[in-house]
């Protein structure tokens, strides 16, 4: 949906269901998405486990998320006029080889192709950056380890701090 339609849907739901903004936020951000479709969880790992056990709603939720990620990648590639690399990071990006494969499937025409063995074994490499690009692909595909603690430390270091408002004890 376009942004205009999203606002209309939000307003329609709020007034039709006669709920507060807080209640609508709870529905849209906590009870929808993976949880709403799968009926299992908002955690992709739980959804994947349920899908592997044969839960069709969990499989649908996983497929929908992978499709949405693929669609987003495609829209960014179009907006930027091409890319040099696709980077997978974070929980799903780093640890879910199956999702990476499904997301990149049928993207050869964009120059994106993943090596099946490299992708399946990316987590075993013990490297910060693992390339999973298939031979001959024009766009590099990388799995990059997330170091959230380091990023928080770097961001915190950049925050200007003023101590003029502090009164320190003089014991």
Where in this protein do the model-derived segments appear?
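Flexible, glycine/charged-enriched surface loops at secondary-structure junctions
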Residues: 21-25, 37-42, 76-84, 114-120
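Buried hydrophobic packing segments
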Residues: 9-13, 47, 73, 153-156
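Short glycine-rich phosphate-binding loop at a beta-alpha junction
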Residues: 83-91
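Adenine-nucleotide phosphate-binding core of ATP-dependent small-molecule kinases
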Residues: 26, 33-37, 44-79
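Internal helix-turn-beta structural module
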Residues: 59, 63-79, 93-162
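Glycine-rich beta-alpha junction loops
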Residues: 3, 32, 92
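Conserved small/polar residues in nucleotide/adenosyl-binding loops
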Residues: 1-8, 164-169
């Amino acid at each position: 949906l376009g942004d205009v339609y999203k606002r209309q849907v939000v307003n329609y739901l709020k007034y039709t269901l006669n709920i507060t903004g807080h209640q609508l936020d709870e529905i849209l951000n906590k009870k929808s998405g993976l949880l709403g479709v799968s009926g299992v969880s908002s955690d992709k790992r739980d959804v994947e486990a349920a899908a592997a056990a044969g839960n069709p709603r969990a499989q649908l939720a996983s497929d929908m998320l992978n499709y949405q990620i693929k669609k987003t990648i495609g829209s960014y590639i179009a907006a930027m006029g091409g890319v040099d690399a696709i980077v997978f990071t974070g929980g799903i990006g780093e640890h879910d080889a199956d999702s990476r494969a499904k997301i990149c499937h049928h993207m050869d025409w964009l120059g994106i192709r993943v090596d099946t063995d490299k992708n399946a074994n990316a987590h075993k490499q013990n490297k910060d950056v693992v390339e999973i690009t298939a031979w001959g692909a024009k766009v590099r595909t990388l799995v990059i380890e997330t170091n959230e603690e380091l990023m928080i430390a770097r961001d915190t270091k950049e925050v200007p701090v003023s101590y003029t408002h502090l009164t320190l004890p003089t014991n």
